[in-house]
Amino acid sequence: MNESNKNNIAGNEIIRGSVLPEWIDVNDHMNVAYYVLAFDMAVDSLWETFGITENHKNVSNSSTFAVESHITWQREMAVDEPYLITSQLLAYDEKRIHQFMRMYHAEKRYLAATAEWLNLHVDLSVRRVAPWPANILQRIATFADQQCDCEKPPEAGKRMTVSSPLYQARGL
């Protein structure tokens, strides 16, 4: 993992990959579902850094559940194009972690998509939120301390709106 503030890349690099042919949709670009898959693979990689592995699950009978996410699509990605995904922790506590990920074109360096996720640490025996084990909480703290000194991303916490709606549901 390295800090990636150079060349307009924000956050700590987590994974690299390339857009697979089966990820392409009828519009000849990466389908929305596969952006989520790529971000999920990045989360799995980050979790390994923290020690949240299959072994952790088996030994402690605990894991993480994603409880909220928000994806933004900025620019298209086409078949075989390389990407890199970075992570920036926005907040964490004894039971939760809130992170923001960015997908960049690995060569052209443009921002292709963002993902904001909230995860809970869960005791699988009772399926309830539970505190992080001390060793994992320490790894999360170390990552947070060593991450880029990035501002809160403009997409973080963003709500969806239509500026001049022809129709709007009551209460919006």
Range-by-range predicted roles:
Residues 20, 100, 118:
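Conserved beta-strand and immediately adjacent loop positions that scaffold enzyme active sites
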